[in-house]
Amino acid sequence: MEHIVIIGNGISGVTAARHIRKNSNNKITIVSAESKYFFSRTALMYVYMGHMKFEHTQPYENWFWEKNNIQLKQGFVSNIHPHEKQIEFRNGETLSFDKLIIATGSKPNKFGWPGQDLDGVMGMYHKQDLEKLEKYAPDNKACNNAVIVGGGLIGIELAEMLRSRKIPVTFLVREDSFWNGVLPAQESEMINNHIKEHHIDLRLNTNLKEIKSDENGRVKSVIIEETGEEIFCNVVGLTAGVTPNIDFLKESGIELGRGVKVNRFLETNIKDIYAIGDCAEQHKAIGQRRNIEAVWYTGRMMGETLAQTICGNKTEYKPGHWFNSAKFLDIEYQTYGWVFSEIGKKENETYFQWQHPKEQKCITISF
């Protein structure tokens, strides 16, 4: 019986564990530094908004893991020793494996802004971020203004969370339209208007220069790069994208790029070591996809695929047609196949677009 160790208990790692258990009696250990039990990251916003409790974000009851003979271990992995087939924890403890799956996800980008590590500066990626937000922005008395930096999905979700408690929000987006690296121009403009209708101060073509501190080391204000304007605030949300969480692998001998380099079978350059999810980087992009795809749906598919290989049925990762979905404010967004933004639009690509004259509904077909 082999010992399969999985670092990371997000959707990729947990899916791999579940499917390995369905197809084998191998020993499985999931290691996480964040929380003992798997939870839905996309549901964290609804905890803050009062729609559910944190325990409701856990898809599986606590007894599920023991019943299915999946061991859970909390600890921060500081290094991997591939030739000894051991992982090393920050406290010096080690854990041996026969096969290792790296599913450590991603972490928020930081660009060296002065003040980016002050109290009151946070992302919205982890359970600890939710706890910070409750501490620094419990209501609009403790937090009379928040500034969010970064015009993607996590940024707008954080804005929606804060507005649910009537906290004023200034939203800094460096592009000239919200999410225009993904959305066609008409859809992006529609969402700009929708954001403003929800009383969010949307600042397009705007970059952060500096986060300023009060005398206690807490956020006091931000400075705008283009104008020098100072915006006073109690909370700053840094949501300017993510990068693979792989710093602990730099001395391991595992081939790294922006992420952990893998082939079509999700194998690294070292036998019996694999990578899946946000931290995995394909040597060559599959079709029109990106080399790294930090998307829930692809993470789940990678976990399912790799489980087959681990259990002796070597299977190539073939994600098929692109699909993604999101919900924020009153907008529900879904995409099937390849619909490019104006920035990424192909030379011979044509759009058919329909938009409801009154309601914020639209359809785009690319051909």
Task: Describe each model-derived feature in a short phrase.
Residues 132-183, 219:
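Rossmann-like NAD(P)H-binding beta-loop-alpha module
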Residues 117-142, 218-221, 229-305:
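FAD-site-proximal beta/loop scaffold in flavoenzymes
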Residues 108, 263-274, 350-360:
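FAD-binding beta-loop-beta segment adjacent to the flavin cofactor pocket
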Residues 1-5, 62-146, 221-230, 237-239, ...:
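FAD-binding core/adjacent interface of flavoenzyme oxidoreductases
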Residues 26-27, 71-88, 95, 164-262:
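A Rossmann-like FAD-binding core segment of flavoenzymes
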Residues 2-70, 159-183:
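Beta1-alpha1 glycine-rich phosphate/pyrophosphate-binding loop at the start
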Residues 2, 9, 279-367:
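Mid-to-C-terminal Rossmann-like scaffold of FAD/NAD(P)H-dependent oxidoreductases
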Residues 8-11, 125, 150-152:
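Glycine-rich Rossmann-fold phosphate-binding loop(s) that bind the pyrophosphate
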